[in-house]
Amino acid sequence: MSLACLRSFFLPALLASTAVLVASFHLESVVGLVPCALCFSQRLMLGVYALVCLAALVHSPAARGRRAYAGLALASAFGGALLAGRHVWLQGDPQVVDGCHLPVEQVLQRPLGEILQMFLLGSPDCVSISWSFLDLTLPEWSLLAFLLLAAMPLSWLVAYRFRKRAMA
């Protein structure tokens, strides 16, 4: 497969993930939304997705490497979708999370296990709905973005599989 065909998948994926990251930082710095623990986790997964796409663009691997990069991109998008789905679920049932909200500075002084638990399972501030657009909350938009980003490598992997079978 030519370099142009490889870039036709990874370049739009990189641009889309970068656009979503820029939008999330815009909502924080300009609009004034304060991100919760799950929002930070979703940003991390989005950054991993963008870095995988950037590495694939720079590296220009052979067939096995393209599949590996597409698999890594799919895994990071799937992980982000799981986190966003958890966030949507928490907002749908606010009784699930209890406790009090701690500033990030205090959270980082806690043991690593508690930090990971908070960033993966959510914290009490994750249940508040502070912004919506077209009747979708920010975690719902995030879930939609991750599902669309996951469709890119998934469609490439499925098409690769069918091309490989057709050639055999």
Swiss-Prot record:
Coiled-coil region list: none
UniProt-recorded name of the protein? Disulfide bond formation protein B 2
Question: Could you tell me where this protein is found in the cell?
Answer: Cell inner membrane
Q: Which family does it belong to?
A: Belongs to the DsbB family.
Any one of the GO CC terms: plasma membrane
User: Which residues point to the Periplasmic side?
Assistant: 27-44, 86-140
InterPro entries per record = DiS_bond_form_DsbB/BdbC (IPR003752), Disulphide_bond_form_DsbB (IPR022920), DsbB (IPR050183), DsbB-like_sf (IPR023380)
Q: What is its main location?
A: membrane
Keyword Oxidoreductase recorded: yes
Q: GO molecular function of the protein, one example?
A: electron transfer activity
- Topology of the protein relative to the lipid bilayer: Multi-pass membrane protein
Role, per record: Required for disulfide bond formation in some periplasmic proteins. Acts by oxidizing the DsbA protein.
GO BP: protein folding
Q: Which domain of life is it from?
A: Bacteria
